[in-house]
Structures are given as C-alpha cells and as structure tokens.
Amino acid sequence: MKHLLSILALFAIIISSGAEAATPARYSTDGDLMLPENWREWVFIGSPTSPDSMNSGEAYQPGFKYVYIDPESFAHWKKTGTFRNGTMIVQERLKVVEAEYMDNHALIPGDYIGLSAMVKDSKRYPDSIWGFFSFGRPPYGEQVPEIGSMDNLGCSGCHYEADQDWVFTRFYPVLLAAKPVF
C-alpha cells in the first residue's frame, strides 16, 4: 500500500509540474483580445519615458509608459528567467508634462493616452509567438483585434529586435533584478 501511495504521489507531482497556469488573456468569439481586468493591480515592472522635448519635438510613442506583467507570469519569470506561454504584458501610456516640482524642473505624468498589450501564445500566434494589441485612447475598447503579426510587422517589427523573447528587458530593472542566475 505504501508503494502504491508513493507512485500516486509521484504521478500527481509530474502532472502538476507540467501544467501551465491559465493566461489572463481572454478572447471574444471573433478572436479579439478582451480588455484585461485589474491590470493596474499586476506587477509593475517599469516606466520608460519618451518626452517629445528630448526627441527633436516628436518622440515615437511619446509619454510615460507604465508597464505591468500578470502575477503568474512574473512568478514564472522569477523561477526560470523566461516568459511562460500565456504571459500578458500591458503598457499604459500617459502624457509627459513639464512642471516645477519642489524647486526643480520635472517631467510628471499627465492624462492617460493609450493602452496596449502583448500576449505570448505559441498556438494562437505560431509565427511570432506573441500577439500585439492596442485598446486605443480612453475610454479603452472592450475588445480589439491583433495589430502586429509578422505579416504586417506593426509592433512585432521592433519587438523582434528585443533583448529576450520579444521583450526589451533592459528597460525593466524589476525584471532584471528578479531574473534568476543559474
């Protein structure tokens, strides 16, 4: 009996270790990505900023970029240093406002100006592994089609050159600090 229980316990461990956590990505029946729930409660990984004033008056995608990763994928990242299938990263853009702050010149976040997301799903996006989406300006769309496949480049044109698995990890100290060293 002891031997049987040991085998059953080992079998349960093997099955559970191969199971992936569910993705936070939800899709409509048409395949459009649904607006993620509570993304501002996810793990905040950084805020790259591209002000027009530092880019000859016209930055590519100007603004503060508040970037979040879903908690399950961040936990996976901390264990493996990889982005699991199902990872969702959300970027919310805000205007850059130049202001006086405590006797200093400062750049502070202004109004929300856009929301985008990328989802890692090797079955749904076999060419690029990641799907890219824009929910537009506030109020954000409830569901949106993919905007960046390898066929039309879009977001994937830049992300193809990213540091690791289509993600510009060098811009996110939270990811770099949490990445395990093997």
Residue positions per predicted region:
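Active-site microenvironments that recognize anionic phosphate/pyrophosphate groups
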Residues: 55
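Sequence context surrounding c-type heme c attachment/ligation sites in exported
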Residues: 24-43, 47-52, 61, 80-182
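Boundary at the C-terminal end of the N-terminal hydrophobic targeting segment
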Residues: 18-21
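Bacterial N-terminal signal peptides
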Residues: 6-16
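Positively charged n-region of N-terminal signal peptides that target proteins for export
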Residues: 1-5
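Short, structured beta-strand/loop micro-motifs enriched in basic residues and often containing a Trp
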Residues: 62-74
